C-alpha cells in the first residue's frame, strides 16, 4: 500500500513537471526584473544561458535584440551573454502610474531562426517625494463655525506606486485644528481639516499651519504645504449638497456642451445669505478646468473640451457652493466622472523586417518580418487581428498575443514578380470595427536559375569567299531572364577540329558582343559549309549556358580561270598538232578542247569560241560553243591551205569572266597518206613514243579488261554501301565525283582535290559512284525528255568536279556494261533544232540550283547507240559544261572521234569484205576496225 501511494505521488509529480516544462517551452518567454534608475551596465540576467544558447553561437547566429518603443534601454553583451542596462530607465516616464511596468524584448537568432520573448519588469523605487499642487492653500472659516467642522484640503500626489506612494499626513501642533485622513472606495486619501476649538476672530484673524506628507518608501520622502486660514465673521449656515460625492458615467466621445450633471445645494439662511453660487474649488486642476465648465448660477456641469479615455479614464471635480453673504459660507462636494471607452482608436502596427531582399529559392516558412500590433482601446475594442492581402506567396503566423510573423508560403520566381507590395491589415473587435493598413515591400533577390536562350536553335549565314581577314559575318545574341551578373552573358566558340585544323583558326566570337569574325579569307573551293556552335554562358554561380548552331555557307566568286587539259603530245610552243585528211566532209570532228574551272555554277560554266587569226582568210573550222569540239564547216578540197593555226578561247560566265586560250595546229594531208603521215609525225614529234603505236591494240584490250573488273568491283561496293544505314553529313575532304551519263548508262570517276563540307569532324571520305549503262527502249526514247531521278542526291563533293574524259580513259574507270539502269539527270534543252551534231542550251537558274546539263541532238543527227558502244555524252556536276561524244552510224564514211582529243586520226575506215573460206583475212579486218575505234 505504501509503495502504491509513493508510485502515484511520483507519477503526479512527473506529470506536473512535464506540464510545467511544456508550458515553458510553449511560451518561450523569460522574465527579469530590475529597479528603475539603475546605472549603466547594471546586470539584468544571463539571457544566453537562460535561453539555452551557447556563447560561441551568439555571433555566428546573428544574436540580436529588438524592442517596441525605445530600443536603447537594454543591451546584450555578445561575449558573455549578459543582459545589462544600457541607459537610464525612469519608470514614471515609461509607464506613468500603471501598477505593472515591463519592457518587452524580442530576441532573434538565425540558423535556424528562433524568436524568444523576454519581459523585464521595472521595479519602482522611492525616487519621487510627495508633491502638493500649490505651496500655499488659503481657507476662509467663519468664526461662528462649530467645533468638529470639517474643511477639505488638497492632498499630495506621489508619482511612485505601491508602498512608495502610500502617503501619511500630519499637521504641526496647534490648539484649534486637527487633520483627518479618509479613504474612499478607490483607496484615495481625502484630507479634511477638523476644527477642534471655536475660533475667535477678534483674538486671531489668521492662522498659519503646515501640513506634512510622508510616503512609505525607504528612505521616506516628504512634502509640505502652507495653510493660510482667514477667520470670517458671522454667517452661521453654510450651503449643503445632497451628497458629498456624485458619480457620473460619460462616453469618452461626448461632444462639447454635453451636460454632465446638475448640482443642487441648499442654505438654511434667508435673504442674500441664501443665494448660492457654484464654482470649481481651488483644488481642481487646470487640466480638469479645461475639460469641463460649470454654470455658477444653475450648478450645471458641461463638457467643454475633448475627452479621451486612453489619457484619463476618470476625473474628480471638487465643487464649492457659497452663499452671497458679506461673510459667505460655503459647502463642498465632489463629482467623480468616469469615462466609458468607445472604439475611437485605430490599431497600430510596428513592422520589423528581418531578411530583405528574399532570395527566390528561399525555403518555405522563411520568416520575412515581425509584426506587432496594439490598440489603445480596452476590452473588445482593443483586441486586434491581422490579415494579409490574398493571392501572394506569403502568410501571417501568430506567434504570441499581438505578435505575428510574415513567412514565405509558396515558391518565388523573380522573373515573374520581382517586388511584392504587401498590405497588412489590422482590425480591432469593436463595433463598428476600425482597421489600419501597413505596406511591406518585399524585394525578391535573383538566383541563377535561367540559362541564356537564343532566339532560334540554328542560324544560316551566307559569306562570299575571299573575304578580308577579321571581317564581321554575323552576330549572335542570347537573352538571360535573370538579373545583374546572372544575366551577364559571354560568348565563346565550342572548339573542335575542322579537318586537320582547329575551328578557332577559321572564326572567332567576341565574348561580350557576340559578333562572329572570319579570321582568314574563306575559299569556296576548300570549304563550302562551315558548321559550328557558339556557347553563351552567364556569370552566375554556378554558371548556366546554352549553345546555338551556325551554318556558314561560303558563296562562290569567280576567282579561278578555266584550266586547259592539254595531253602530253608534241607541238611548237605548247600548241597541239592534228592531221586531217582532205577528203573529210562537213561536220568532221578534228579535235576537242577540254578545260575545267574549279568554281561552281555560272562561274564554272565554260563556253568555247574560235578566234580568227590576224590576216587569215575564212577558215573551214568551227568550235562547239559548249562542247569544245573542233569540226569542219564544209568539205575540204585541194585549194585549202595545208596548215591552219586555230586559237580557241575558253571563257567562263562569271562576273567578270575569266578566259584561257588553246592553240591547235591543223595540217591537211592526202587521204592515203594520213595514217603514215600521222605515224611519221608522231615519230618525229615524240621520238621514242612512236614505238608504242603498234601495241595500242593490245594495250586497249588490257585496259578494257582491267576496267571491266574494276567497274564490277565498284558496283558491288556501291550496292553494299547503299544498303547500309545512311549517316549524317560530316566534314569531308576527298575526291569529288564526276558523273557521266548517256543512253547506255552512267559512269563516275574521282580526281584528287580538296572539297569539304564542314559540318562535323569525321575523316575525309571519297565520293565514288558508278552506274551500269542501260540500252534505250525504243527509237522514241531519244526525243522524249527524261524525268529527274528521285533517288539521286547531289553530293557537295560533286559540285566542283569538272574533268575531261581523257582522265577517265587514263584511269580506266569510264566503262559501261549492258543491262544497267539509266541514270537520269535534270535537263534543260534547246527547243530549236541545230544543224550541228550536239549543242547545249544554258540552264534555267544556272549557278543557283542547276548543276547538270544534258546534250540535245538535232533532228538531223539522231542519237544512235548500240550495246557496248561508248556514250554520246557525259555530265560534269557543278559545271554547266557537257562533254559530248558524238556517234555516227556504222556505215558512215566520216571518221568522227568519240573519246579522242588532240590524238592522231586515220583518214578513213577500212572496208570489210566478206570472203568465204578466208577466216584469217576477216579476223584481220575486224582487228583493224577495233584499232581505229580505240584511237578515236
From Swiss-Prot:
Residue ranges, annotated region (5 X 4 AA repeats of P-X-X-P): 773-890
Subcellular locations according to the entry: Cell membrane
GO molecular function terms noted in the UniProt entry: calcium ion binding
Gene Ontology CC annotation, any one: plasma membrane
Glycosylation sites: 264, 547
Residues that span the membrane, as ranges: 697-717
Region of interest (Disordered), ranges: 759-793, 816-936
PXXP repeats: 773-776, 785-788, 818-821, 873-876, 877-890
Annotated Basic and acidic residues bias: 895-909
One BP term from GO: cell adhesion
Record's keyword annotation contains Isomerase: no
Biased composition (Polar residues): 774-786
SMART domains: CA
Membrane-side (Extracellular) residue stretches: 29-696
One family name in Pfam for this protein: Cadherin_tail
Major localization listed first in the record, in broad terms: membrane
Top-level taxon of the source organism: Eukaryota
Annotated membrane topology: Single-pass type I membrane protein
Disulfide links within the chain: none
Cytoplasmic face residues: 718-936
Free-text function comment from the UniProt entry: Potential calcium-dependent cell-adhesion protein. May be involved in the establishment and maintenance of specific neuronal connections in the brain.
Name under which the protein is recorded: Protocadherin alpha-5
Lineage: Eukaryota, Metazoa, Chordata, Craniata, Vertebrata
Gene (UniProt): PCDHA5
